[in-house]
C-alpha cells in the first residue's frame, strides 16, 4: 500500500506553485513512497545505547560578535535597484 497518494503529491506541487504532468506526479509518488518507507525502517534501529546528538559531526561554529556596521548611503543602493520609490526598492509581486 502506498504511504502517499498521487492527489497529495499534486496538492503539494500546487502549494509550491509547481506545474507537474500526470507522469511526473506518478513518478514523484513512487519516489516519495520509497523515501517514506526508508524513514520508517529507521524507526526500527535500536538506539538505546546511542547518546543523543544535535549534529552529525563534533564540530562547533565559532562565531564573531554580531556588531552593526556602517551601511551604504541610500543613494548608492538605489543606483543598483532597477525600480525604487520613496527610498524603498520595489520588486514584482509574487503572491496572488
Curated annotation (Swiss-Prot):
Gene Ontology BP, a term: regulation of translational fidelity
GO molecular function: asparaginyl-tRNA synthase (glutamine-hydrolyzing) activity; ATP binding; glutaminyl-tRNA synthase (glutamine-hydrolyzing) activity
EC supergroup of this enzyme: ligase
Cytoplasm among keywords: no
InterPro entries from the UniProt entry: Asp/Glu-ADT_sf_sub_c, GatC
Keywords from the UniProt entry: ATP-binding, Ligase, Nucleotide-binding, Protein biosynthesis
Reaction catalysis annotation: L-glutamyl-tRNA(Gln) + L-glutamine + ATP + H2O = L-glutaminyl-tRNA(Gln) + L-glutamate + ADP + phosphate + H(+); L-aspartyl-tRNA(Asn) + L-glutamine + ATP + H2O = L-asparaginyl-tRNA(Asn) + L-glutamate + ADP + phosphate + 2 H(+)
Family matches, as Pfam families: GatC
Domain of life where this protein originates: Bacteria
EC number(s) recorded for this UniProt protein: 6.3.5.-
Functional note: Allows the formation of correctly charged Asn-tRNA(Asn) or Gln-tRNA(Gln) through the transamidation of misacylated Asp-tRNA(Asn) or Glu-tRNA(Gln) in organisms which lack either or both of asparaginyl-tRNA or glutaminyl-tRNA synthetases. The reaction takes place in the presence of glutamine and ATP through an activated phospho-Asp-tRNA(Asn) or phospho-Glu-tRNA(Gln).
Family: Belongs to the GatC family.
Subunit field text: Heterotrimer of A, B and C subunits.
Protein name: Glutamyl-tRNA(Gln) amidotransferase subunit C
Lineage, uppermost ranks: Bacteria, Bacillati, Bacillota, Bacilli, Bacillales
Amino acid at each position: 500500500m502506498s504511504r502517499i497518494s498521487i492527489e497529495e503529491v499534486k496538492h503539494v506541487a500546487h502549494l509550491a506553485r509547481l506545474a507537474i504532468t500526470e507522469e511526473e506526479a506518478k513518478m514523484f509518488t513512487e519516489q516519495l513512497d520509497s523515501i517514506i518507507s526508508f524513514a520508517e525502517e529507521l524507526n526500527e534501529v535500536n538506539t538505546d545505547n546511542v547518546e543523543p546528538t544535535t549534529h552529525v559531526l563534533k564540530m562547533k561554529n565559532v562565531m564573531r560578535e554580531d556588531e552593526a556596521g556602517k551601511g551604504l548611503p541610500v543613494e548608492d543602493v538605489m543606483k543598483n535597484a532597477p525600480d525604487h520609490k520613496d527610498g524603498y526598492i520595489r520588486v514584482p509581486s509574487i503572491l496572488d
